[in-house]
Regions:
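N-terminal lobe/hinge region of extracytoplasmic solute-binding protein
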Residues: 34-129, 156-159, 234
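Gly/Pro-rich hinge or "lid" segments in bacterial periplasmic/extracellular proteins
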Residues: 96-114, 159, 203-276, 281-285, ...
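Ligand-site clamp/hinge motif
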Residues: 138, 227, 258-310, 352, ...
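Extracellular/periplasmic solute-recognition and catalytic clefts
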Residues: 177-180, 242-253, 278-342, 349-353, ...
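Surface-exposed binding/hinge segments that line
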Residues: 136, 170-218, 236-245, 389-402
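Aromatic- and charge-enriched surface segment that lines or borders ligand/interaction sites
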Residues: 62, 66, 89-96, 123-167, ...
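Aromatic-rich, solvent-exposed beta-strand/loop patch
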Residues: 118-122, 144, 149, 189-210, ...
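Detector for C-terminal structural segments
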Residues: 8, 14-15, 26, 35, ...
């Protein structure tokens, strides 16, 4: 999968498509970068200049002579029962890998921040006030059945996603009109001006074949884009579904006559003949499958396993390679997240008390071998993270919402409580109890009760047995406060359904953030999204100050303003204690059977970029064990 802004943002849906640029030559004059004055251009950047000129041959980080062929066996956790990306996050469990089939208008470069180049679109233009954007499709873009990709397909895709996906409904809420404005042109009109992001994020739209979705299947039944389906989808991308067993495996094969194989942003990518995803119940089972050479490549998210589980013969014999890749392209909030739609979590003092009870330091020592850092920002590890006390432009922005935010955020830096030794634990539990009493609770007969005498009971909902260890470690600290705690583990299908309907108290959730946040923040934290089932506002935040700051982020006129506005948003979210932050690690941990090659210089913002820019190495494969 290629890491893109959208794939970072959409944890529950499919990632953006793999890249491309034209086989049909365009003049440099026609695609000059220029100012935003209606000039056709080959790429877009939110801030600053783009790196690659109109006539570039390929991205610098790829191997243009990469060998072709071979198969990659990859892992997926849980199950799947759906190939329809439109209803992802709303209905069913989406199959892994569908980003290989579906393409977008534009595609990002992995060595630039917030820069995209043409994929299905050969060129893009917008007026100086950014009140609209027009994309011109490539004349040679084709669906796998040979039919051309048309503006009607783009219009159909936009209307379908916006009507049926909470994510896209929020993401594209400022688009008021979409119309065909030329034989190969499609224009999106916005309800305002000055939104720097809108012309670019429209290019992230996955494009679907209108004629296929409005047709019938092999049994003569009319397809319904609003429902789940296990019929392999028609796409325009470099791969198509070869075979699938619902809930167990799905295999993709390279499209022999793929229209975009010679595009310059595709050179050096899509090198494998086949890709296969095998499904496992949880990460522990998947690890054993990897050890048994049933999986080729694994991303390891558990510090304990990274430290202890990779001491097996194939690692010692260098047949399995462990390698870490720096994470520079995303900030991440991973946390215990409250459902503040429920009365017991509406008071921020209650939520803050839960943070005082979380002994991260001891958990890090016992469970994670000291590998992790505590998260202290929704944009952890980036220049967007709030630090210290607000100053300069950030302070000026916060003054506009001064009466709607906690006063402490102006004079105190946000910090998580530090535990780890008996005295600290005792002091923090005492502070937690003080906060709970201020919120109207008291301890009676070892139970925490509210003013009505009702006991505080919470359920920690998880979807993988591996998470049970984490929540069971947290549970005794909460019980020491008199809180009744239950832990419930459900399968992925049940878990998704409960989240869509907000049927939970506390979950482990994560929100990936790009280096250029924007419209998606409405879906994460905006008041309107709080009432939309299936939205990413899992917490249920309805906060006027947050809404105001989200709009300031979206309509920032410079990188400086964007950074300051995002820091302000981050600070307000932190000081409302909507979550108990967990932990992070600044590298992507990977393990692979030594059958593959990758470029010597990896893209700065691509992490491992597997399998996008990797290839099958016949010489290495010959020395590796024969696959089972």
């Amino acid at each position: 999968m290629k890491l893109t802004r959208r794939s970072i943002l959409r944890a529950s849906a499919f990632a953006a498509a793999l890249p491309a640029l034209s086989r049909v030559p365009l003049s440099s004059a026609a695609l000059a970068q220029g100012a935003p004055d209606g000039t056709w251009r080959h790429g877009l950047s939110l801030f600053g200049d783009i790196k690659y000129p109109a006539d570039f041959k390929h991205f610098e980080y790829v191997n243009p002579q990469a060998p072709q062929g071979g198969m990659v066996r990859r892992v997926a956790i849980g199950t799947f029962d759906n190939f329809n990306t439109v209803v992802a996050g709303v209905k069913g469990s989406l199959a892994s890998g569908l980003e290989l089939v579906t393409e977008t208008l534009m595609t990002p470069a992995l060595d630039e921040v917030s820069t995209v180049y043409g994929l299905l679109a050969e060129a893009v233009r917008y007026p100086e006030d950014r009140s609209s954007v027009t994309y011109r499709l490539r004349a040679n873009a084709r669906w796998h059945d040979g039919q051309p990709v048309t503006p009607d397909d783009v219009l159909f895709s936009f209307e379908t996603f916006k009507a049926n996906s909470p994510f896209y409904g929020a993401y594209y809420r400022h688009v008021t009109k979409v119309e065909k404005t030329g034989e190969r042109e499609i224009t999106f009109t916005f309800n305002g001006t000055g939104n720097r992001e809108l012309p670019q994020i429209v290019g992230e739209l996955p494009v679907l074949p209108k004629h296929w979705w409005q047709g019938t299947d092999k049994n003569g039944n009319k397809r319904d884009v609003t429902q789940t389906t296990l019929e392999p989808p028609l796409g325009s991308g470099p791969y198509k579904v070869k075979e699938a067993t619902p809930g167990r495996s799905i295999a993709y094969e390279k499209v022999a006559d793929y229209w975009g194989k010679d595009l310059n942003v595709n050179i050096g990518t899509n090198n494998f003949a086949q890709m296969r995803f095998d499904y496992y119940r949880d990460s522990t089972v998947a690890l054993e499958a990897f050890k048994g050479d049933q999986i080729d490549f694994r991303t390891e998210n558990r510090a304990k396993d990274w430290a202890t589980a990779y001491d097996f013969p194939a690692v010692r014999d260098k047949k399995v390679i462990k390698e870490e890749f720096p994470v520079r392209n995303t900030g991440m909030m991973q946390a215990f997240a409250f459902n503040i739609r429920r009365d017991k979590f509406k008071d921020p003092r209650v939520r803050r008390a839960f943070n005082f009870a979380f002994n991260f330091e001891e958990m890090n020592r016992q469970l994670f071998y000291g590998a992790y850092q505590r998260i202290g920002s929704y944009f952890q590890g980036t220049e967007l993270a709030a630090t210290g006390v607000p100053q300069g432009l950030e302070l000026e922005i916060l003054q506009a919402v001064k009466d709607k935010v906690p006063a402490d955020l102006f004079t105190k830096p946000y910090t998580n409580p530090v535990n780890g030794d008996p005295n600290s634990v005792r002091d923090n539990l005492r502070q937690a109890l003080t906060l709970l009493r201020e919120a109207g609770y008291e301890v009676k007969n070892t139970k925490l009760v509210n003013a009505k005498g009702e006991p505080m009971q919470v359920e920690l909902l998880v979807e993988q047995p591996a998470f049970e260890t984490i929540v069971l470690f947290y549970k005794p600290s909460l019980e020491r406060l008199g809180i009744g705690v239950s832990v419930r583990t459900v399968d992925s299908s049940q878990y998704e359904n409960r989240l869509r309907q907000w049927q939970f108290d506390i979950i482990i959730a994560s929100w990936g953030e790009s280096l250029s946040p924007g419209n998606e923040q409405r879906g994460f934290w905006g008041s309107q999204a709080a009432d939309i089932p299936g939205s990413r506002n899992l917490i249920g935040i309805k906060n006027q100050a947050v809404d105001t700051l989200i709009e300031r982020v979206i309509f920032s006129k410079s990188r400086e303003e964007l950074v300051a506005a995002t820091k302000a948003l981050d600070r307000v979210l932190l000081w409302n204690f909507y979550v108990v932050p967990q932990w992070t690690y600044p590298f992507q941990r990977t393990a692979r059977w030594d059958r593959f090659g990758h470029p010597e210089t990896m893209p700065k913002y691509g992490q491992a970029a597997f399998p996008n820019i990797w290839w099958w190495d016949k010489d290495k494969a010959a020395k590796a064990p024969q696959r089972n």
